[in-house]
């Protein structure tokens, strides 16, 4: 798995609500969240499939 899969979810400081997914390391699964459109980190994916491919293996 990529190193950034261990990063905590970061919504960012902006006001948008962009449906996204992040990998929750302790739960070993990809979960949905609303990205704000700016800021955040690399633990953010457009689809659950992309999240699983990158972080689950």
From Swiss-Prot:
Q: In which tissues is it expressed?
A: Expressed by the venom gland.
SMART domains hit by this protein: KU
- List all disulphide bridges recorded for this chain: 5-55, 14-38, 30-51
Q: What is the effect of changing residue 34 to A?
A: Slight increase in binding affinity for Kv
Classification via CDD domains: Kunitz_dendrotoxin
Where in or outside the cell it occurs: the entry states: Secreted
Which chain positions carry the site (Important for binding to potassium channels)? 3-4, 6, 8, 10, 26
Q: Which GO terms describe its molecular function?
A: potassium channel regulator activity; serine-type endopeptidase inhibitor activity; toxin activity
Q: What effect on the protein does mutating residue 46 to A have, as reported in its record?
A: Decrease in binding affinity for Kv
Keywords (alphabetical) are: Disulfide bond, Ion channel impairing toxin, Neurotoxin, Potassium channel impairing toxin, Secreted, Toxin, Voltage-gated potassium channel impairing toxin
**InterPro entries in alphabetical order:** Kunitz_BPTI (IPR002223), Kunitz_BPTI_sf (IPR036880), Prtase_inh_Kunz-CS (IPR020901), TFPI/VKTCI-like (IPR050098)
Q: Name one GO cellular component term.
A: extracellular space
Query: Which residue numbers mark the site May be important for binding to potassium channels?
Result: 7
- The source's superkingdom equals Eukaryota
Q: What is the effect of changing residue 52 to A?
A: Slight decrease in binding affinity for Kv
BPTI/Kunitz inhibitor domain location: 5-55
Q: What is the effect of changing residue 31 to A?
A: Slight decrease in binding affinity for Kv
Kindly give the Gene3D superfamilies that the UniProt entry links to this protein: Pancreatic trypsin inhibitor Kunitz domain
The task this protein performs is described as: Serine protease inhibitor homolog that blocks voltage-gated potassium channels (Kv).
Record family assignment: Belongs to the venom Kunitz-type family.
Name used for this protein in its record = Kunitz-type serine protease inhibitor homolog delta-dendrotoxin
């Amino acid at each position: 798995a990529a190193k950034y899969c261990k990063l905590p979810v970061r919504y960012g400081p902006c006001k948008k609500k962009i449906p996204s997914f992040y990998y929750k390391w302790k739960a070993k699964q990809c979960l949905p969240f609303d990205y704000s459109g700016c800021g955040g980190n690399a633990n953010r994916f457009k689809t659950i499939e992309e999240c699983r491919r990158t972080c689950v293996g």
